Swiss-Prot record:
Region described as Disordered: spans on this chain: 246-304
Protein name: Probable beta-glucosidase btgE
Function: Beta-glucosidases are one of a number of cellulolytic enzymes involved in the degradation of cellulosic biomass. Catalyzes the last step releasing glucose from the inhibitory cellobiose.
Gene: btgE
Record: active site: E405 (proton donor), E501 (nucleophile)
Family, as annotated: Belongs to the glycosyl hydrolase 17 family.
GO cellular component terms attached to this protein's record: cell surface; extracellular region; fungal-type cell wall
Species in which this protein is naturally found: Aspergillus fumigatus (strain ATCC MYA-4609 / CBS 101355 / FGSC A1100 / Af293)
């Protein structure tokens, strides 16, 4: 038996070893061959098996029941003990603890305060005074009321004379947690051809009339700025109010010139960003305010005489390109034959100073020259201040106008404009200019911000367009302008008033009693010239066919040169 067991064990071992080797050679085939090999037919076995059977009655074998055992459990309780040791440390007097460095406070700047009133009522905004020591470029804020619908607003408007690429700074907002933050960013814009382009505007859709607040670049110059206490009566829910600072306490010395933040064009032909002649669609509200009579006359330095004082001139073709020198010389010279004594120029682009200056000198005209502030703000206009200072033909200049409806258009606030006028005046005076400097805005802006502007303006400059008052017909245009001038005389007591832009369109759509047309234009122009011609600059020499039609479709059709005999 032992031999059989050993033989059987040996056979199984051999089969297992063979299976392992087979599995290594053929893998899955070994799973079908796990059995002992058959013995050969003629082999003999050396073992004999005997079976012994015993017969007898069945016997029950009792199974003993297990003896139950008793298990005793013991409760175990674990006790936790905590010991505390108190150590008192006395600091040495020779090693005092270092005091933390005080945090640097941010210098407050007179940016407009924006307040949202969720419900109707009367609210009081407390007064605030801020003193600024350094010139700083910041994101200001402006508002515009949009009627229901889709509108595009803001952005930077630039005029280029040829295809070019410009690198342009613009103001925008970025999300910051649950709010938004106004920032100045820069973009590269390809202008495919000559023309006027608006870069990075914002488009929005409003379901109802809504006041939109959006950022604009602004330069804060040194000085003391006051935000007076304001009482606001809110007549509708969710109303947004912008409370600007005013520079009532101007610095005794001239503030530093604002830093220029505009990035120049990336091509050698850098585009002018301030070449667009102003639109005239600003509605001038009528007023019934009683104004004291004034005996002041036009300033002697302007050379104003009876009849018509001046006319605006922009050196652009019908397509918006720059005119050649010969055209400018002949057209400006013709103003003298019409009885004008002044020509008003808005900007320095298209060689305006050189060409118009030469024509003015030859013809015996005086110039009212301008620094045009566009949507780039005052920083984008600094180059014009430099250009005028270098040109410096002051014997031709009777007045410099810094900005044309810049506040009305939302390009800067009153305090920013006042600071820029002050710094520009200093630059002109340093270059030898001894004449007068002002700005020009509609009457409503002067009424709202006269306290800020009067101190830096030598005269009150206003754009008075009777056509945009729906109750004024062409034959009443002169009386309307005269009434507005009287109101303006009361805003800056002791300072003269000039109507720096006025006229009447000869085509377009009616605005109530104000009807455009060739005959209506002639009637309105004569009415204005008869009433206040010696204090008025007429708009404009030619039609500006390169403009958009604008409100009432009249923006292109203000040319009135041929109306004068």
């Amino acid at each position: 038996m032992r031999g059989a067991i050993l033989a059987t064990a040996a056979a199984l071992a051999g089969t297992a070893m063979a299976d392992v080797a087979h599995m290594r050679r053929h893998g899955h085939d070994s799973f079908h061959q796990r059995r002992s090999p058959l013995a050969e037919a003629d082999a003999t076995c050396g073992c004999t098996t005997e079976v012994v059977t015993v017969w007898g009655p069945p016997t029950l074998i009792p199974v003993a029941s297990p003896t139950p055992s008793t298990v005793t459990s013991e409760a175990v309780t674990t006790l936790h003990s905590t010991s505390t040791t108190t150590v008192t440390v006395i600091a040495s007097a020779s090693t005092p603890a270092a005091s933390p460095s005080p945090a640097t406070d941010k210098v407050p700047l007179p940016t407009p305060a924006i307040t949202n009133f969720p419900s109707t009522g009367v609210y009081t905004i407390p007064a605030t005074t801020v003193t600024v020591f350094d010139t700083t470029t910041v994101c200001g804020a402006t508002t515009t009321e949009l009627p229901a619908g889709t509108h595009t607003y803001g952005g930077v408007t630039t005029v280029v004379e040829t295809a070019t690429t410009v690198v342009c700074p613009y103001a925008t907002v970025e999300p910051s947690g649950t709010t938004v933050t106004s920032v100045i960013k820069t973009t590269t814009y390809v202008c495919p051809s000559a023309g006027t382009y608006t870069i990075a505007p914002t488009t929005t859709t409003v379901p109802t009339s809504t006041v939109i607040v959006y950022p604009t670049p602004a330069v804060i110059t040194p000085g003391t700025y006051t935000q007076p206490e304001q009482t606001v009566t809110v007549t509708r829910t969710d109303y947004t109010y912008v409370c600007p600072f005013t520079g009532q306490d101007e610095p005794t010395s001239a503030p530093a010139a604002p830093s220029t933040t505009a990035v120049p064009a990336t091509t050698t032909a850098a585009p002018e960003t301030t070449t667009a002649a102003p639109d005239t669609t600003t509605a001038v509200p009528s007023t019934s305010s009683a104004a004291p009579s004034s005996s002041s006359t036009a300033p002697a330095s302007t050379g104003a005489v009876s009849g018509q004082m001046g006319m605006t001139y922009t050196p652009y073709t019908k397509g918006g390109d720059c005119k050649d020198k010969s055209s400018v010389l002949s057209e400006v010279a013709a103003l003298k034959s019409k009885g004008f004594t002044h020509v008003r120029v808005y900007s320095t682009d298209c060689n305006s100073l050189e060409y118009i200056g030469e024509a003015a000198r030859t013809s015996g005209l005086q110039m009212i020259i301008g620094v045009f502030i566009s949507s780039t703000g005052v920083s984008g206009a600094q180059d014009q201040v430099t250009a005028i200072s270098k040109w410096a033909q002051w014997d031709l200049v009777s007045l410099i106008v810094v900005g044309n409806e810049a506040i009305q258009n939302g390009y800067c606030d009153a305090s920013t404009l006042a600071g820029f006028i002050s710094s520009a005046k200093s630059a002109f005076q340093a270059a030898g200019y001894t004449g007068k400097v002002t700005t020009t805005e509609p009457i409503n802006v002067w009424q709202a911000h006269g306290s800020t502007l009067c101190g830096v303006c030598d005269i009150v400059g206003a754009n008075i367009h009777p056509f945009f008052n729906a109750d004024v017909s062409a034959d009443q245009a002169g009386k309307f302008v005269a009434q507005e001038i009287k109101v303006l005389e009361s805003i800056c007591p002791g300072k003269d008033v000039l109507n720096l832009e006025t006229g009447w369109p000869h085509a377009g759509n009616a605005n109530g009693k104000a009807v455009p047309g060739t005959s209506e234009q002639a009637i309105a122009i004569k009415s204005i010239a008869d009433e206040v011609g010696s204090k008025s600059v007429f708009f404009s020499y030619f039609d500006d066919l390169w403009k958009e039609p604008g409100q009432f479709g009249v923006e292109r059709y203000w040319g009135c040169f041929d109306t004068f005999n």
